[in-house]
Amino acid sequence: MDLSFLLEELTRGFTSFTWGNAVMILVGVVLITLAVVKEYEPVLLLPIGFGCIMANIGMSADTGFMKVIYDAGIKTELFPLLIFVGVGAMIDFSPLLAQPKMVLLGAAGQFGIYGTLLLALLLGFPLNEAASIGVIGAIDGPTAIFVGSKLAPDLLAPIAVAAYSYMSLIPIIQPPIMKLMTTRKERLIRMEYTPRPVSRLTLVVFPIFVTVAVSLVAPDAAPLIASLMVGNLLRESLVVDRLSKAAQNEIINIATLFLGLAIGATMKAESFLNLQTLMILGLGLIAFILDTVAGLLFGKLMCVFSGGKINPLIGACGISAFPMAGRLAARMAQEEDFENFILMHAMGANTAGQLGSVIAGGLLLALVSAL
């Protein structure tokens, strides 16, 4: 009786297994370790890590049920948009509406997008890929995935890994830059919080107004901003509590799980282990640093023009990583003076950064698509 076919079937997985697959499985294990042990952005790094392992044992996004998930949620941009609905339902824009000048910091915090775009072009990346890499500077995973899936789907895996990894490393990357760019005297500046009252009507009208205004200015950003704002409208209307809680919990959690698995499933050894991936990861770090530096410099400028009434630390909050960046700036201020509370100011800048990242990503998508 010839059992060679049985032996061939039993060893099929081993014969197609390469050293590259082993390395990528190790990468997946590292991502899972960072999620479990260090608790770095665990809701995303854990499924991305497991998806990476799956991709290198024959369950990539090219075949089987992972292809169904990838096609349904990544190619259609559904998962990033569902996540934005959940994020919008979590965000309180009242600190920003009470301090409209914080919008300036949200704009300054997007400098890394365009600075990294230019750097990627200098390194030889075509415009569509350079733009996708630049959007890592939004420090906003859903925006990076949304733009990347349209402009450079082949680079989606390293772009997503870079965006979420650096977002989780905010407490490690930002503090040295913040201390280097500001003096102790600046970090000790106390900011009075005497906000103008924000009415319920304003909170309800705001998401509607922003959706219309941004969609007219940057039509390609319309899906992102509409998803973010419908989530916020659920929160602020106070009449659909079940939908608001569902957006904040079940919807965003399920979308995040499947998005992480789908992105991880694209991390096959043959497409991930190359110099280009290392360059993307390096450029992503540069984008993050440029965002922080630009925000701090603008914060220092606002400090000068306000007569020393604005703590420059809040400039580092003008990125999309909500609420981590805001909390970090507040903690840095309290390390110098335990009674220095700048949290609400920092949150105002942080929510401005969330809006700024969506608008900047949409404008970039529109400009590149038009060329």
Predicted regions and their residues:
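Membrane-embedded hairpin module used as a gating/binding unit in multi-pass transport
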Residues: 165-239
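Hydrophobic transmembrane alpha-helices of multi-pass solute/ion transporters
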Residues: 2-16, 37-38, 50-78, 233-259, ...
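Alpha-helical membrane segments and immediately flanking helix-loop junctions
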Residues: 71-76, 85-90, 104-115, 119, ...
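Structural signature of hydrophobic alpha-helical transmembrane segments
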Residues: 12-24, 68-83, 129-137, 164, ...
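Entry/N-cap segments of selected transmembrane alpha helices
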Residues: 93-117, 268-295, 346, 350
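Transmembrane helical segments that form the transport core of multi-pass membrane transport proteins
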Residues: 210-295
